[in-house]
A protein has these predicted regions:
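Domain-level signature for proteins that mediate thiol-based redox and metal-cofactor handling
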Residues: 1-99
C-alpha cells in the first residue's frame, strides 16, 4: 500500500465514523468523553486543526458542523440531554485518565 492509498483509506474510515455518529444521535457526547476521551466536538476541533496545518482557514462552528451534519447548536437542541449527576462524576473521573 502506498501513502496515497493509505490516506484514501484513512479518509474513508473518518467519513464512516462521522456518518455513524450522525446516525447515533442517542449517543451523548459526555458518554463518548467518559468512555473514549473524545467526542463530536473533539473531532470537529481536530478537523479544524488539520485544516490549519495545511493553511486552510475554517471556523470552529463550520468544522463542528461538518461532524454533526448541522450546526452544533441545532444538534444540541434536537438531541442533547441534560447530563445526570452520575455522568458528571464519571466525566470528572475520566478527565484524570484522558489527555
Amino acid at each position: 500500500m502506498d501513502e496515497r492509498e493509505q490516506t484514501e483509506l484513512e479518509a474513508a474510515v473518518f467519513r464512516r465514523l462521522v456518518d455513524h455518529l450522525r446516525r447515533r444521535t442517542d449517543v451523548q457526547n459526555i458518554d463518548l468523553m467518559i468512555t473514549a476521551g473524545f467526542c463530536r466536538n473533539c473531532l470537529g476541533d481536530w478537523y479544524r486543526d488539520a485544516a490549519a496545518e495545511r493553511g486552510i482557514e475554517i471556523g470552529k462552528e463550520e468544522a463542528r458542523a461538518r461532524v454533526y451534519g448541522m450546526p452544533q447548536g441545532e444538534w444540541k437542541k434536537r438531541y442533547q440531554k441534560e447530563a445526570t449527576p452520575e455522568q458528571q462524576k464519571a466525566f470528572e473521573e475520566a478527565q484524570k485518565t484522558h489527555s
